From Swiss-Prot:
Sequence motif 'KMSKS' region, location on chain: 610-614
Class of enzymatic activity (EC top level): ligase
Residues binding ATP: 613
PANTHER family: LEUCINE--TRNA LIGASE, MITOCHONDRIAL, LEUCYL-TRNA SYNTHETASE
Name the UniProt record assigns to this protein: Leucine--tRNA ligase
Family that this chain belongs to: Belongs to the class-I aminoacyl-tRNA synthetase family.
Cellular localization per UniProt: Cytoplasm
GO biological process: leucyl-tRNA aminoacylation
Cytoplasm keyword on record: yes
Swiss-Prot/TrEMBL keywords: Aminoacyl-tRNA synthetase, ATP-binding, Cytoplasm, Ligase, Nucleotide-binding, Protein biosynthesis
Length: 833
């Protein structure tokens, strides 16, 4: 057989690994550890797509490489299995979401195993397993005990027809719900919040210690959004009312000509004049129909209403009209802004729209034409005139503090984490509300608080989750006869994924989240690989929970993930017509190398695009494994380009990877393998070991595979192959194409044992040194010959070789040699006349 029969070989080795528990996590305390973590998937009904294996293959290569280097390797997999699609499916079909989830997990697991990943399945976790979410609930009770979990009235996106609140992302730009197209209103509701803001400074500062890309760190820094500025208090004219504004530029206070409150601000009703009351009520209603995203869109037309009231500018006593406008959010900052239209574009547009005064306080622009947003010396600012930004801020803050109407303030863009969902399919929040007005956490001895099985998971209609319908579960009575009601909100999907990497370390512990000694042994995670779409929320939430558990003494490290790597996206092929509209692949035919719309006959342009069901360009790994084999898929996805690049899927590229594996198979199975080394491949082999080792370490898998190809080409030029080089090469390719490597190892090593723990090959530095080098021979300063000579020859030897060369002889024939200058390892210069 001169080709690699994947249909026979791959299932054979997958069966072997499962039967022998080949990838069970090592526990030898004398060995170093390596914890390779994948972002665990949500097991959707669609199954794996070819984007999933890219990250999984990367961690698998590292895990196999580290095992061969003698490390204890922890390489686990699990399921982030709570989520809306399962609940939606259950509502549509009347089936239990747990059954749907279980079927999906079985399918995902089958697909993952077919790709030959070296997971330790004894450590599998599932966020919907009560034995798992017992500890998710336990963490919540600890947050509650420490005052970091609290209830608050929060405006939510309420959809009356759906009987539930929806996330900002589920609100369409026209203010209707994504599902059903129903009206969405902003309505205050009781919600659970987690006080992530208490950790803002630590979440910010500790980023410096992490081996993460600067772009991801910057995304987190921006999300946390630390600002140093001042709180300024404005009195409302003719009343005892006042309100506070946070500003990063208190030095521009002399240019503040009006103030804007969020329509929901608590002062609005109290300060609105009777003449403006109707307009204000109407505007507040309109604002409640919009999502936060729509309200803060910079491109939208500025709208607002004057309340009829005035604020007093604390530095110059001038009256400033108080407006309400939907671009100011009650949930952000203090819900009030001081407007400096000369130096802020949004304020400038608002001032122009409503004919409000614009006062320049920083020189350098023409504020009648546009806002000047650069820095400049202060003007029209009394005691700040002529000062730069830094000095002016210091002076104005001192003045405000002296007057008692302001002080320096550090704020964060980060908001507390809205932690409750009005859904059924999530972890029950372990809190009981008693009729005497108190609330208590469910005691640890009663955890897990198990999600009750029910067919009735329609929304309750009251804004509570479907759990409010389940009276038997809902109502409880204390020993003293006091009646209570369980919390009906469930946790968001983020909860289970905020700590799953800890449970992998000790997944079957019934007494605690995980054993302290095991946590000390394995933390932090050495490499975490996943998509950049989780750069902010998931990673921030996991870091927050980890720091909280560190404060409790549960975990020994301040940070969970030492190194983070985001793989790129695998794009599908798309087709566009002359208008730029996308055409589904099943409506396209290829003729003479061009692409045409089957129905219209129009020639189409081919371009990469994100894989999607609507474009029918999703590639299923099952089809690839069936046709080409898992090893081909693994090698192709690693060879496509740099791991962090987004690259289009290509059948031609897949075929190229398959041909390479067939060449490897033929090289090892058909070449004569000898016990003696003739030295012909010394340099090529040692270069390959060195390059592949270094490139795996630095996650440059595409260049590692390119080097393996270089060796195959070199080896194919020889008649025979030295057995140690054959073995070493098989070991080098094993992390990339493990099934093929196992099969070839059996033949060459004459063993029935797995290659997985065979010591990684080493290289001989002396074999990398060139024995010969090229020198140039110059005559009268012009290069006349290039010669391969032994390295480090003496001047005399070089001169002798150069003068004996036929080409040189012909050039100097009949001429007198004046002198010969020889520079070892470089050149020979012959001067003639």
């Amino acid at each position: 057989m001169s080709f690699y029969n994947h249909k026979e070989i791959e299932p054979k080795w997958q069966g072997y690994w499962a039967e022998h528990h080949t990838f069970k996590t090592g526990t030898d305390a004398s060995k170093p550890k390596f914890y390779a973590l994948d972002m665990f998937p949500y097991p959707s009904g669609a199954g794996l797509h070819v984007g999933h294996p890219e990250g999984y293959t990367a961690t698998d290569i590292l895990s196999r490489y580290k095992r061969a280097q003698g490390y204890n390797v922890l390489h686990p997999m699990g399921w982030d299995a709570f989520g809306l699609p399962a609940e939606q499916y259950a509502m549509d079909t009347g089936n239990d979401p747990a059954e749907f989830t279980s079927e999906n997990i079985a399918n995902f697991k089958r697909q993952i195993n077919a790709l030959g990943f070296s997971y330790d399945w004894d450590r599998e976790v599932n966020t919907t397993d009560p034995n798992y979410y017992k500890w998710t609930q336990w963490i919540f009770t600890k947050l509650y005990e420490k005052g970091l979990a609290y209830e608050a009235e929060v405006p939510v996106n309420w959809v009356e027809e759906l009987g539930t609140a929806i996330a900002n992302e589920e609100v369409l730009p026209d203010g209707t719900s994504e599902r059903g197209g129903y009206p969405v209103v902003r309505k205050p509701m009781r919600q659970w919040m987690l006080k992530i803001t208490a950790y803002a400074e630590r979440l910010l500062n500790d980023l410096d210690e992490l081996d993460w890309s600067e772009s991801i760190k910057d995304m987190q820094r921006n999300w946390i959004g630390k600002s140093t500025g001042a709180n300024v208090t404005f009195k409302v004219k003719g009343t005892d009312k006042e309100f506070t504004v946070f500003t990063t530029r208190p030095d521009t206070l002399f240019g503040a000509t009006f103030t804007v409150l969020a329509p929901e601000h608590e002062l609005v009703d109290a300060i609105t004049s009777s003449e403006q009351a109707e307009a204000v009520v109407d505007y507040k209603h309109q604002a409640s129909l919009k999502s936060d995203l729509a309200r803060t869109d910079l491109a939208k037309e500025k709208t607002g209403v004057w309340t009829g009231a005035y604020a007093i500018n604390p530095v110059n006593g001038k009256e400033m009209p108080i407006w309400i406008a939907d671009y100011v959010l009650a949930s952000y900052g203090t819900g009030a802004v001081m407007a400096v239209p000369a130096h802020d574009q949004r304020d400038w547009e608002f001032a122009k729209q409503f004919d409000l005064p614009i006062v320049e306080v920083l020189e350098g622009g023409n504020v009648e034409e546009a806002a000047y947003t650069e820095d400049g010396l202060h003007v029209n600012s009394d005691f700040l005139d002529g000062l730069n930004k830094e000095d002016a801020i210091a002076k104005i803050v001192a003045c405000l503090e002296e007057k008692g109407c302001g002080q320096e303030k550090v704020t964060y863009r980060l908001r507390d984490w809205l932690f409750s969902r009005q859904r059924y399919w999530g972890e029950p929040i372990p809190i009981i509300h008693w009729e005497d007005g108190t609330s208590t956490a469910v005691p640890e001895t009663e955890l897990p608080l198990v999600l009750p099985v029910t067919k009735d998971i329609r929304p309750s209609g009251t804004g509570e989750s479907p759990l409010a319908n389940l009276t038997d579960w809902l109502e409880v009575t204390r020993e003293d006869g006091v009646k209570g009601r369980r919390e009906t909100n469930t946790m968001p999907q983020w909860a289970g994924s905020s700590w799953y990497y800890l449970r992998y370390i000790d997944p079957h512990n019934t007494e605690k989240l995980a054993d302290e000694d095991l946590l000390k042994q394995w933390l932090p995670v050495d490499i975490y690989v996943g998509g950049a779409e989780h750069a902010v929320l998931h990673l921030l939430y996991a870091r927050f929970w980890h720091k909280f558990l560190y404060d409790l003494g549960v975990v020994p490290t301040k940070e969970p993930f030492q190194k983070l790597f985001n793989q790129g996206m695998i794009l599908g092929t798309s087709y566009r017509d002359h208008r730029g509209a996308l055409v589904a692949t099943d409506k396209v035919e290829k003729r003479d190398g061009s692409f045409f719309h089957i129905e219209t006959g129009e020639e189409l342009e081919q371009a990469p695009a994100k894989m999607s069901k609507s474009l029918k360009n999703v590639v299923n790994p099952d089809d690839v494994v069936e046709q080409y084999g898992a090893d081909t898929l693994r090698v192709y996805e690693m060879f496509m380009g740099p791991l962090d690049a987004s690259i289009a899927w290509s059948e031609e590229g897949l075929e190229g990877s398959r041909k390479f594996l067939d060449r490897v198979y033929r090289l090892i199975t058909s070449k004569e393998i000898l016990a003696e080394n003739n030295g012909a491949l010394d340099k090529a082999y040692n270069e390959t070991v060195k390059a592949v080792t270094e490139q795996i370490e630095s996650l440059k898998f595409n260049t590692a595979i390119a080097q393996l190809m270089v060796f195959v080409n070199a080896a194919n030029k020889e008649d025979k192959l030295y057995v140690d080089y054959a073995k070493g090469f098989i070991q080098l390719i094993a992390p990339f194409a493990p099934h093929l490597a196992e099969e070839l190892w059996q033949t060459v090593a004459e063993t029935d044992k797995s290659i997985s723990y065979v010591a990684w090959p080493t290289w001989d530095e002396s074999k990398l040194v060139e024995d010969e080098i090229e020198i140039v021979v110059q005559i009268k300063g012009k290069v006349r010959a290039k010669l391969m000579v032994a390295k480090d020859l003496s001047r005399e030897e070089l001169q002798e070789i150069a003068l004996a060369d036929e080409k040189v002889k012909a050039e100097i024939d009949g001429k007198e040699i004046v002198k010969v200058i020889a520079v070892p390892n470089k050149l020979v210069n012959i001067v003639v006349k």
